[in-house]
């Protein structure tokens, strides 16, 4: 393939990714808002068996010793505390059962498949970009935004089967628009020159490029997802006053899931900072220069280190560490994008121009 064909393919993939993410966002919002989830679908016993709560379900209904609660939604589903018998394979009950199963599968399968297609389109976009430029596509802000969007969708697809059905929909309703905004910002706001593939600048011609930048972007994506869950937890926690205690289990599971994901992203952030220090010593002769990007990366590390520490402190469960994670969400974005607005420092390849 020649360069012209690759240029056309890249433009087509970028437009297709934007459209697919837009449709995915709409579907996740639609299913989260209008699809009623029954109690049996809220707790996934295969993935949350290690989460313990002190809450006792009113009628004693349990699944693998995990209490099952209804969801906290503007539209409250009807609670059915009795186990439903499996419908017969023939007759009206059988047909209704099959119809219900088909609707249930479609409700989660369609947006999940569309998220997967979006992820695949982003992969193809990055591969075409790699072929055009001759290097791993992380040399400027445009490429890193596309890679960050891919990381967010990939992590969601990687963990979605571990989420409960409702958490999967709610998290998809957050990740899909975030990825859409990344794609839109990279496509419509950044200079056209940045969107064109170009050779690496001398400072980036190193094997550390893939190691350092890739790990940092993965850590950003993971911390963003975990922080979004903490923000969602805070919203539900604030409005749970006056609601039955049966909602507490679902809210607490959100908090526990946020902790698990942030706990995964923190080591990536640590490795990314350390690898960046080694690369800086090779390129600039110093492990640390207090560059704005370095300083804010350190602040990001400190915020989430405090978050993880408070999770181990008695009396700091729930709302307090979630507030720290919410602050971390803002710090991550400023470290990634906000610092670039300053236009100063050694990380000039990440600026907006």
Curated annotation (Swiss-Prot):
GO MF, one annotated term: heme binding
GO cellular component, one term: chloroplast thylakoid membrane
Additional free-text comment from the UniProt record: Met-1 is the initiator; however when Met-1 is mutated a low amount of protein may be produced, probably from Met-20.
Keywords, ordered alphabetically: Chloroplast, Cytochrome c-type biogenesis, Membrane, Plastid, Thylakoid, Transmembrane, Transmembrane helix
Localization terms from the record: Plastid, Chloroplast thylakoid membrane
One GO biological process term: cytochrome complex assembly
Membrane topology field: Multi-pass membrane protein
InterPro entries listed in its UniProt record: Cyt_c_assembly, Cyt_c_biogenesis_CcsA, Cyt_c_biogenesis_CcsA/CcmC
Protein name: Cytochrome c biogenesis protein CcsA
Mutation effect (residue 291 to E/N): Abrogates production of c-type holocytochrome. Permits small amounts of cytochrome c6 assembly
Keyword Cytoplasm on entry: no
Function: Required during biogenesis of c-type cytochromes (cytochrome c6 and cytochrome f) at the step of heme attachment.
Effect after changing residue 296 to A: No effect on activity
Chain ranges passing through the membrane: 15-32, 209-233, 261-278, 296-313, 324-342
Phenotype when changing residue 290 to A: Reduced amounts of c-type holocytochromes produced
Disulfide-bond pairs as recorded: none
Lumenal side: 33-208, 279-295, 343-353
Resulting phenotype, residue 284 to A: Severely reduces amounts of c-type holocytochrome produced
Keyword presence, Plastid: yes
Residue intervals on the Stromal side: 234-260, 314-323
Effect noted on mutating residue 347 to A/E: Abrogates production of c-type holocytochrome
Source superkingdom: Eukaryota
HAMAP family: CytC_CcsA (MF_01391)
Main location: plastid
């Amino acid at each position: 393939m020649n360069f012209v064909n690759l240029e056309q393919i890249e433009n087509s993939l970028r437009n297709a990714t934007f459209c697919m993410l837009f449709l995915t966002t709409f579907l996740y919002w639609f299913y989260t808002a209008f699809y009623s989830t029954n109690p049996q679908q809220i707790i996934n016993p295969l993935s949350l068996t290690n989460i313990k709560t002190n809450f006792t379900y009113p009628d004693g209904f349990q699944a693998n010793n995990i209490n099952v609660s209804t969801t906290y939604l503007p539209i409250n589903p009807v609670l059915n505390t009795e186990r439903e018998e499996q419908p017969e394979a023939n007759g009206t009950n059988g047909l209704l059962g099959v119809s219900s199963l088909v609707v249930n599968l479609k409700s989660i399968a369609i947006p999940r498949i569309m998220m997967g297609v979006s992820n695949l389109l982003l992969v193809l976009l990055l591969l075409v970009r790699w072929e055009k430029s001759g290097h791993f596509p992380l040399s400027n802000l445009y490429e890193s935004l596309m890679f960050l969007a891919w990381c967010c969708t990939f992590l969601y697809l990687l963990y979605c089967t571990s989420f409960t059905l409702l958490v999967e929909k709610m998290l998809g309703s957050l990740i899909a628009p975030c990825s859409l905004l990344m794609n839109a910002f990279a496509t419509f706001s950044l200079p056209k020159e940045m969107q064109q593939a170009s050779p690496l600048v001398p400072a980036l011609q190193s094997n550390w490029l893939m190691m350092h930048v890739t790990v940092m972007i993965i850590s950003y994506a993971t911390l963003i997802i975990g922080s979004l869950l903490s923000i969602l937890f805070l919203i539900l926690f604030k409005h749970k006053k006056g609601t039955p205690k049966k909602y507490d289990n679902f809210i607490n599971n959100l908090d526990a899931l946020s902790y698990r994901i942030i706990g995964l992203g923190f080591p990536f952030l640590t490795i990314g900072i350390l690898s960046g220090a080694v690369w800086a010593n090779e390129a600039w002769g110093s492990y640390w220069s207090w560059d704005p990007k370095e300083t804010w990366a350190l602040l990001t590390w400190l915020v989430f280190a405090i978050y993880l520490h408070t999770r181990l402190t008695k009396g700091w469960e729930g709302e307090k560490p979630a507030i720290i994670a919410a602050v971390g969400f803002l710090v991550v974005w400023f470290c990634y994008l906000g610092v670039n607005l300053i236009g100063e420092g050694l990380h000039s390849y990440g600026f907006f121009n």
